[in-house]
């Protein structure tokens, strides 16, 4: 059965769901129709922009395990480079930051380290803690752009045919907490806005 969902983890989930449906006596035709009509879940390996020569995927991955899985899933669907835009949340588990930095360095072909939402922490300090997992000197494939919109824009500008731009950390969220203040924000909508600015002239 064909589906619109991306990523190997979705294949595993669908396999389990198909098996359960079959065991419950649901016909193969109904199962096939159900799978074909599945829609992406907002912020979960979501294709944010259509009709570009490269993929733009938004995912909520905000833990080391989540980041590793989504990068591996991206590599499985990408002919070109996997380009990661990511950061880490403030006022949360600080120990995971260098681990996520190491994972990003190891698995992504290009990395743009950016701010996510700092809450009440110093945003630069959060980035520094992520960078501590990337080695003493940032490798050439890693750039740091604090402004999240500019980081996403840069990734979209340098993406080439067959690449995947992967924007992680906020997923389906519709706001960020910056210096204690809620600010409207959605990675998918921002990626779409920037795409229009760059490619629909």
Residue ranges, per PLM feature:
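A short glycine-threonine-serine/GTX helix/turn-capping micro-motif
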Residues: 1-8
């Amino acid at each position: 059965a064909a589906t619109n969902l991306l990523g190997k983890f979705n294949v595993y989930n669908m396999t389990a769901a198909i098996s359960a449906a079959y065991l419950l006596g649901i016909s193969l035709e109904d199962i096939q129709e159900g799978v074909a009509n599945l829609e992406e879940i907002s912020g979960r390996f979501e294709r944010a922009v259509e009709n570009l020569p490269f993929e733009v995927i938004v995912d909520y991955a905000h833990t080391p395990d989540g980041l590793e899985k989504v990068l591996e899933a991206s590599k499985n669907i990408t002919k070109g480079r996997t380009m990661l835009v990511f950061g880490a949340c403030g006022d949360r588990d600080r120990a995971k930051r260098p681990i996520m930095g190491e994972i990003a360095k190891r698995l992504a072909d290009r990395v743009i380290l950016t701010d996510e939402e700092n809450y009440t922490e110093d945003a630069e300090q959060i980035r520094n803690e992520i960078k501590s997992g990337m080695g003493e000197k940032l490798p050439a494939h890693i750039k740091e752009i604090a402004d999240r919109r500019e980081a996403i824009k840069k990734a979209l500008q340098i993406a080439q045919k067959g690449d995947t731009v992967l924007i992680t950390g906020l997923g389906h969220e519709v706001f960020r907490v910056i210096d204690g203040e809620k600010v409207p924000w959605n990675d998918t909508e921002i990626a779409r806005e920037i795409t229009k600015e760059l490619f629909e002239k």
